[in-house]
Amino acid sequence: MSEEKNDALVGEVNTDNADNQVWLIKVPKFLSESWQKIGQGEIGQIHIKGGDNISLSYGPDVGQEFQLITTANTLDNQPLKIFSEDKDGALALEGNIGLRCDIKIDVESPQYRDLMKSRHTKYNTKTRMTQVIDESELFTPTLFDANKVKVSTVGITQKKKSTDKKEKLPEDEVLDLIFSAFRAEKHLDLKTLESFTEQPKNHLKTILEKVCILNKRGPYHHLYELKPEFRDKDNSKDEKK
């Protein structure tokens, strides 16, 4: 784009690519982080094998492939458009989203199992910080002089609520994360599962009630474990391998 044409677009929207059809693919956090580490260049490839059989492979050395679950964008689905902005602030309409895709994760793949184990280890490792204090900074007691006491007012401020809201994942994706967590440990508390799945507490508890038992007494008090029907199902998958 020439400088003359670019200057004319400042404050306006370039619609040259308005008719382009664009795909919108929702990816999990670990995949997004992997792409960010790659930096510039190719981050993956889309493989169209016919019909709805579409997959995504990423990273030159990873060699992992994900199936894509597609949803056609219709007038009933609020239509979305893609915009871009260059360093000079010029806006451009890059196209319309014609297809929405969600990644279907193979929870039985070795790569995904290794990822879940590393996340589980990370969230269950307590870190402590050691700080060296200079002796000159230590408290030195002084004589108390009541005449030098100054009266001041104290205000109480309400603690700001965290704005870092966790994004709700679809139930099937959360279930995959829950089953993966219980492959590493048979009993887990809510805090660990909440950190592991990165889901809002109430949303997670609703799903846990469907597949888990919360022990209310005994040595596993306040710990979750899979219900027998899901535990046996998960074990049978491992035995087939």
UniProtKB/Swiss-Prot annotation:
- Which InterPro entries does the record cross-reference, listed alphabetically? TFIIF_beta (IPR003196), TFIIF_beta_HTH (IPR040450), TFIIF_beta_N (IPR040504), TFIIF_interaction (IPR011039), WH-like_DNA-bd_sf (IPR036388), WH_DNA-bd_sf (IPR036390)
> How does the record describe its quaternary structure?
Heterodimer of an alpha and a beta subunit.
* Family note: Belongs to the TFIIF beta subunit family.
Q: State what this protein does.
A: TFIIF is a general transcription initiation factor that binds to RNA polymerase II and helps to recruit it to the initiation complex in collaboration with TFIIB.
Q: Which GO terms describe its cellular component?
A: transcription factor TFIIF complex
GO biological process annotations for this chain's record?
Answer: transcription by RNA polymerase II; transcription initiation at RNA polymerase II promoter
Keyword entries, A-Z? DNA-binding, Nucleus, Transcription, Transcription regulation
- What SUPFAM superfamilies does the record tag this protein with? Rap30/74 interaction domains, Winged helix' DNA-binding domain
Mind telling me which PANTHER family this protein's record contains? GENERAL TRANSCRIPTION FACTOR IIF SUBUNIT 2 (PTHR10445:SF0)
Quote the subcellular location field of this record.
Nucleus
CDD domains hit by this protein: TFIIF_beta
**Predominant localisation class:** nucleus
Provide the protein name. General transcription factor IIF subunit 2
Q: Name one GO molecular function term.
A: DNA binding
Q: Where are the transmembrane segments?
A: none
